[in-house]
Amino acid sequence: PAKTPWTPMTNPLSECKVALISTAGIYMKGDESFDYERERREFIWGDPTHREIPREAGQDDVEYSHLHIDTSFLKKDRNVAWPVDIFLGYEREGKIAALTETLYSIMGYIPNFNPLVKQTAPKMIAKMKGEGVEAAFLFPV
């Protein structure tokens, strides 16, 4: 079996810049949605791309495109699958040093994960490193 890479924390979260990643297929209104139409046609395909959302985006600024979850609950409260408001509170309280300017979303249904691992993840990691991210939280749905 492959070894899972592990990087231990060197600072407490109160000193870390934190990124959030959701698998709920979240995207900004006006931006390209995740390709769930292709997924409808090809049930063994899942969109391996990602979307970047500014942290200032509000509940009404985003949309959800996911065939495998009921997104109606997200439209009422995004924090169910992507606790942005909770982490902004942590930032105000000093529990984290900062929340990144960019928040990330991918699809949770990606049967062929090679494009995600070889293309999407490196792009996301490069962006996070550029923002000085020291910890990332993944919220799978």
Over which residues does each language-model region extend?
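Metallocofactor- and cofactor-centric catalytic cores in central/energy metabolism, strongly enriched
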Residues: 1-141
